[in-house]
């Protein structure tokens, strides 16, 4: 694991020790992640080699590795990578998961993803791509790193979150309620630290990847369930929210819930490579 650290690293380094307790291990976090796992499991098969952007504490990489998928898990936070590496070792899947530092805050027109062979697919879960103002260089880099027909699964925070509007307007916080409409606004990442975030619409994200990737489907994740900072509500009324979780899984694939949600999941497929005359 590289010791390099970019501007994104410090807030996530600070959040790393408590991230699983604050999100992954709570009821809401489990429901949201299991919804994503359904799509990861359908997109990546045992024996395939996939790339993860923004692996965090490694929960998704370990889950895929247990299913026989080999994962190159990357993150910009050395502390997150350290937690993820320990988790993979404890789960006895260290032979199927490798970890490396990849700083998405350094994305520019020259951004590249190192690879010795083409990946069978790639994914990024729970908003890692929201930390990037323009994701087109990432799309171009993934196009160069993923084989033809390979799936790319992206889970991104969108701009239209009714739960956020209702909660913050109900508490007299109009500016916070509509913060997702501001470009490059600040979001809290535990321990009082903040990062700059952008909230692309499904239409914009699809357009950013359109040159090299076909759109397969878009699904709302957290259309009826609240954002993670309201996990205490789910803990207080679990039966009520279990019903909303079922609505999430049954209606999230339909409009308007593909747009009205905390996150949306987009499945893309690498277009066939154009063969150039040799």
Predicted regions, residues:
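Conserved class I S-adenosyl-L-methionine
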Residues: 1-45, 47-56, 59, 63, 153-182
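Acceptor-substrate binding/catalytic loop of class I
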Residues: 188-204
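Class I SAM-dependent methyltransferase SAM/SAH-binding core
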Residues: 57-106
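A C-terminal cap/extension of S-adenosyl-L-methionine-dependent methyltransferases
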Residues: 203, 207, 217-274
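A short SAM/SAH-binding and catalytic strip from SAM-dependent methyltransferases
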Residues: 121-134
């Amino acid at each position: 694991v590289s010791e390099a650290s970019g501007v994104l690293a410090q807030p996530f380094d600070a959040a790393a020790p408590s991230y699983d307790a604050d999100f992954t291990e709570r009821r809401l976090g489990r429901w949201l992640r299991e919804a994503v796992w359904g799509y990861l499991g359908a997109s990546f098969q045992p024996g395939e080699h996939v790339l993860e952007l923004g692996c965090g504490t490694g929960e998704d990489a370990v889950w895929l590795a247990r299913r026989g998928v080999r994962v190159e898990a990357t993150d910009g936070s050395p502390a997150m990578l350290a937690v993820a590496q320990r988790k993979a070792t404890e789960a006895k899947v260290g032979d199927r998961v490798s970890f490396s530092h990849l700083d998405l805050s350094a994305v520019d027109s020259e951004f590249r993803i190192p690879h010795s062979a083409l990946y069978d697919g790639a994914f990024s879960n729970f908003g890692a791509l929201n930390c990037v103002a323009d994701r087109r260089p990432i799309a171009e880099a993934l196009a160069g790193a993923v084989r033809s027909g390979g799936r790319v699964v992206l889970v991104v925070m969108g701009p239209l979150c009714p739960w956020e509007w209702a909660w913050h307007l109900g508490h007299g916080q109009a500016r916070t309620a509509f913060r997702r409409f501001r470009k490059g606004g600040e979001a809290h990442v535990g321990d009082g630290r903040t990062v700059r975030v952008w909230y692309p619409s499904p239409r914009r994200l699809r357009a950013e990847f359109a040159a090299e990737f076909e759109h397969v489907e878009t699904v709302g994740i957290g259309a009826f369930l609240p954002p993670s900072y309201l996990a205490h509500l789910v803990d207080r009324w679990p039966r009520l929210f279990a019903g909303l979780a079922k609505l999430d899984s049954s209606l999230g694939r339909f409009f308007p819930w593909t747009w009205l949600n905390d996150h949306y999941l987009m499945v893309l497929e690498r277009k066939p490579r154009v063969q150039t005359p040799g």
